[in-house]
């Protein structure tokens, strides 16, 4: 990018009055032609909540939760897919394809459907049914591959080369991280350009954390922020090749995909170099969390913030919690945790994390018994009676 030129075209004052509340409000920082229309679905400008109750529980001064699960297909991946659709439009493509553990697939299918494009989606057979249902609803041709994500990726790569489809795979298409970087641009604008100490995010193939870091560096280059935050790379213990590389100082090696957090279960990360560079350049922290810690974070976010994240979506928050418990985050720190996907994408694991509802017949005595059996007492709330007022006409 020509940052000197961008400085003449984009100012904080211009952004403040811009009405486009989507990722495309930052067009000057995005690699698209001026004449290229933004794709139909409104992606981005997701809410940033100040999570005071959760911050208090974790023992830190300020915590913000960026809920990217409210995007059109319910994940941060919509940012990459919106960019992919825009670039496919520029290329005159009518068919787009990708491989995915779930979120990138549903994201591409939805964004492409809105733009009138055909999609071919390759998913590993373990992909949650909720995500596959999204694909089918959006009219995608879905190929469920009986194998690992690595095998799924290789098959999609061969098919794309054979039939000449536009490639949305993150490792192949460099524009996708440019779409994902908008989450970082939004965080900083929503914080009124005040830089947090840390940004915590879940990591799978590495494209998201690499994009986040690129966006922050762009803002620093044009003078919108005066320093850069440290990144927190959170991975599942059962699949953490990138974090393990940082911890050991050795090159990354493939791992088995052994975690319920399907969206980050990537044993062979395709954006490893960019992700590792982002973590190292930011002097970032790495943390690996168990499936049990991930499920606990689902409950914690839901009950303190009202945010419902899928397992992979809350892994950043789970990692932050673990680091706080280990004393690695200072009590006066300001932290942003990015929730990358909505919990409705994986209802089965949400139920496993939070339990089943109380099931009884329509009987008050049975209700009281159920409360007592669960160690609960029904709250007694006395409502203040308000006298009726006479109406005069």
Predicted regions and their residues:
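PLP-dependent amino-acid enzyme catalytic core
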Residues: 1-393
